[in-house]
Amino acid sequence: MGRAFYIGRFQPYHYGHQSVLKRIAETADEIIIGIGSAQLSHEVNNPFTAGERVLMITRALAHLDCPYYVIPIEDIQRNALWVAHVRSMTPPFDRVYSSNPLVVRLFAEVGISVESPSMYERETHCGTAIRELMLNGEPWEDRVPPAVVSVIREIDGVERLQQIAGSD
């Protein structure tokens, strides 16, 4: 079974991520969840801090029947070194789950097994669509687990996103 690695920006964490992690939990002994672009926040495409994303994921997965670690991973500007950077920040793992073509390629080049899970209702359950709903003041809460709704409300996440998207 082994230890699996799954990386995403989780801006915000949503049911698409939840679906993939539940499937990974069926075959893994442990899961490492990497919060990619951890240094980014307070931007339209990256409104939430790494700590806020840790909170979203941890609360949403409270009942997951598989041990997991949530680890923020900052970007580096050299793709050829990125896998080594990830490995230096995480416990060892033997399997990667990602649908990102660059992530798939980089891990495959160093001989790590990569699986590309299909995303749950990708068109509606993606961070871009959810942030767009938030920006437009439209309902978004049905796209994320209730625990994530609570975190976003607790941090005034929608107001933050709308404010940073405003123009002077």
Swiss-Prot record:
One of its GO terms (molecular function) is ATP binding. It is found in: Cytoplasm. It catalyses: beta-nicotinamide D-ribonucleotide + ATP + H(+) = diphosphate + NAD(+). Keywords: ATP-binding, Cytoplasm, NAD, Nucleotide-binding, Nucleotidyltransferase, Pyridine nucleotide biosynthesis, Transferase. Its main location: cytoplasm. GO terms for cellular component: cytoplasm. Pfam families: CTP_transf_like. Pathway: Cofactor biosynthesis; NAD(+) biosynthesis; NAD(+) from nicotinamide D-ribonucleotide: step 1/1. It is an enzyme of class 2 (transferase). One of its GO terms (biological process) is NAD biosynthetic process. Its EC number is 2.7.7.1. It comes from the Archaea. CDD domains: NMNAT_Archaea. NCBIfam families: arch_NMN_Atrans, cyt_tran_rel, PRK01153.1. Belongs to the archaeal NMN adenylyltransferase family. This is Nicotinamide-nucleotide adenylyltransferase. It comes from Methanosphaerula palustris (strain ATCC BAA-1556 / DSM 19958 / E1-9c). The lineage of its organism: Archaea, Methanobacteriati, Methanobacteriota, Stenosarchaea group, Methanomicrobia.
